[in-house]
Regions:
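Conserved strand-to-loop turn within each blade of WD40 beta-propeller repeats
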Residues: 78-79, 132-135, 200-203, 241-245, ...
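Per-blade loop-tip surfaces of WD-repeat and WD-like beta-propellers in eukaryotic adaptors/scaffolds
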Residues: 46, 86-102, 135-175, 182, ...
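Fungal eukaryote-biased detector of long internal structured cores
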Residues: 96, 105-137, 141-145, 170-172, ...
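Canonical WD40 repeat/beta-propeller blade segments in eukaryotic WD-repeat proteins
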Residues: 57-66, 110-121, 179-189, 225-232, ...
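Structural hallmark of WD40 beta-propellers
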Residues: 70-75, 125-130, 194-198, 216-218, ...
Length: 439
């Protein structure tokens, strides 16, 4: 599911032509990658299947758990701070425009009346979920506990410091409050195993926590302004962030620092995601990832796709007296002079000390600023601020195999022979750019 603002979703396309959509000047019905064409599958708007109205507040965020045991698989966070869990199937079966069979938490903002900014189920958490708020606090709930019970927390001792407090009573829900920062928490994301929680906020910091021990592991600051979004790789080794500096940053959990940054957007980056369904054309035989594919969307209306190659992440280690600097590749542990201690929040590193990424494609996919990005096995899904969703189908297997053959694709062969050592601070990727503009 993706956020929409006006109940409209994209519908079936009436044309398979690569010509531009006449209703969206400058936007084509496909974009190309080294694997082949991603074709626009849905481009018209249709009425929503179900519309739910909230009388006193607006929904701000939601999360879906397909593995929920009791049927309550959908979380909804409101502008008032209220939180609901409901059964998606039950909502679709009911003809009314009201929630049915909902469990209600933080009713009327009784625990926290600032708006919900991000919400997530805890992977493997047996119904546990977390809710982030605009005042910099995050609350941990247990779905099976009564949401109407009183939860009282002590006063925050130092608003500038991270702190965790448990509820005063064992039957309370929420069960814990995490004070993350003084400004709003803009987005949260769990690693796939649920071991780590990443948050990004208005203060421009990424923070990564060990969720079980409730300790800060690492984090750092953007180059400018707030961070707006974050996402984990499936193996939990890397975290993406994007924000008001128009950049995408790649963080390494092993090194606890930024290992690459990407430049290509012309405005704020509003969504980032790894493509866990994409298969790297190369393999080192160890079962380890040698290349990651990820995407980003921004308020410049563009979708950018990126390739992160482990052998091309080259970072300076140290400069011997009177000699040239030594380097370490991303296939090993890319340590600099000093190992970053656990629990350290770092300033933004000097850009020339971190490898720079360029997108493999940049494509204008909507006429309005983009708000969301999601990868599925069959497609790439994009959503814009006006509530329109587009689904781009992946290249067919035969097309992918044809383009991966050097004899059939001279351009691919040329790119595959380029050496990553030609430029030690920049990753070799070609930009295939569509039209773009800054909002």
């Amino acid at each position: 599911m993706m956020n929409t603002s006006n109940g409209m979703i994209s519908g079936p396309s009436s044309s398979s032509s690569p010509a531009a959509n006449p209703q969206s000047p400058g936007i084509k019905t496909y974009f190309k990658t080294p694997e082949g064409k991603y074709k626009l599958h849905y481009e018209k708007t249709h009425s929503s299947v179900k519309s739910i109205h909230f009388s006193n507040s607006n929904p701000m965020c939601h999360a879906f758990d397909p593995d929920a045991k009791d049927g309550h698989d959908l979380l909804i966070g409101l502008n008032s701070g209220d939180v609901y869990t409901v059964s998606l199937r039950q909502q679709l079966q009911d003809v009314s425009k009201k929630l049915v069979g909902a469990l209600h938490y933080n009713k009327d903002g009784s625990v926290n009346n600032s708006r919900c900014t991000s919400i997530s189920w805890v992977p493997g958490g047996d119904g546990a979920f977390v809710v982030a708020h605009a005042d910099g606090n995050l609350y941990v709930y247990e779905k099976n506990k009564d949401g109407a019970t009183d939860s009282t927390f002590p006063a925050i001792r130092d608003p500038t410091q991270f702190s965790v407090d448990k509820a005063k009573y064992s039957k309370s829900n929420p069960v814990a409050r995490w004070h993350i920062c003084q400004g709003a928490i803009n987005s949260i994301a769990f690693s796939n195993d649920g071991a780590h929680l990443a948050t990004v906020g208005r203060d421009g910091y990424l923070r990564i926590f060990d969720f079980l021990t409730q300790k800060l592991v690492c984090g750092g600051k953007s180059y400018y302004g707030a961070l707006l979004c974050c996402s984990w790789s499936m193996d939990g080794k890397y975290i993406l962030t994007g924000g008001e500096d128009d950049l995408v940053q790649v963080w390494s959990m092993e090194d606890r620092k930024v290992v690459a940054w990407g430049e290509g957007h012309n405005s704020w980056v509003s969504g980032v995601a790894f493509d866990s369904y994409w298969s790297s054309p190369n393999s080192d035989g160890s079962g380890e990832h040698v290349m990651y594919r990820f995407g980003s969307v921004g308020q410049d209306t563009q979708l950018l796709l990126w390739d992160l190659e482990m052998d091309e992440i080259v970072v300076p280690l140290r400069r011997p007296p009177g000699g040239s600097p030594t380097y370490s590749t991303g296939s090993q542990s890319a340590h600099w002079d000093n190992v970053i201690p656990v629990g350290t929040l770092q300033p933004a590193p000097c850009k020339r000390d971190v490898p720079k990424l360029s997108p493999i494609i940049a494509h204008r996919v909507h006429t309005e600023p983009l708000s969301g990005l999601m990868f599925t096995q069959e497609s790439v899904v994009t959503a814009c601020r006006e509530g329109h969703i587009k689904i781009w189908t992946r290249p067919s297997d035969s097309e992918t195999q044809s383009n991966s053959c050097p004899e059939a694709n001279p351009t691919s062969a040329l790119l595959s022979t380029s050496s990553p050592k030609d430029n030690k601070t920049s990753l070799s990727s070609k930009v295939i750019s569509g039209s773009s503009f800054k909002q």
